[in-house]
A protein has these predicted regions:
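A short, ordered amphipathic alpha-helix with a cationic face
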Residues: 18-24, 58-61, 72-73, 84
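Amphipathic alpha-helical interaction elements
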Residues: 53-60, 78, 87
Length: 111
């Protein structure tokens, strides 16, 4: 277990860097988690983060890659609902990284 430290909070993470307590998530935590992944959040990132949190609220699980891309396509259109777009924002393991930054558990079927 590790911890995410800042002047504003001290939050426990699992061994892969996911929040142990989902209720501890907020936008400041997201910025710190993104920083740990070498990502500087832009409005494009926040759009996906909000969407993945909406998916979690609806289905009670973080989406794996294919489900994430399909959901983005449905909600934001075909320009953004492509693997290349989401990977450009969150890297090669986009579903895992986006879920982590969004304060959600690791998606099922993600190695």
């Amino acid at each position: 277990m590790s911890k995410l430290h800042s002047q504003a909070f001290d939050i426990s993470l699992d061994d892969e860097g996911y929040l142990l307590t989902l209720d501890h998530w907020n936008e400041l935590v997201a910025v710190e988690l993104a920083s740990g992944e070498n990502i500087k959040l832009t409005e494009a990132h926040w759009e996906i983060i909000r969407l993945i949190r909406k998916f979690y609220q609806r289905y009670q699980q973080a989406p794996a890659s294919r489900a994430l891309i399909n959901y983005v396509r449905k909600e934001l259109g075909s320009d953004k609902g492509r693997s290349v777009y989401v990977m450009r924002l969150f890297g090669g393991s986009a579903a895992k990284t986006a879920a982590k930054i969004a304060g959600l558990p690791k998606p099922d079927n993600c190695i």
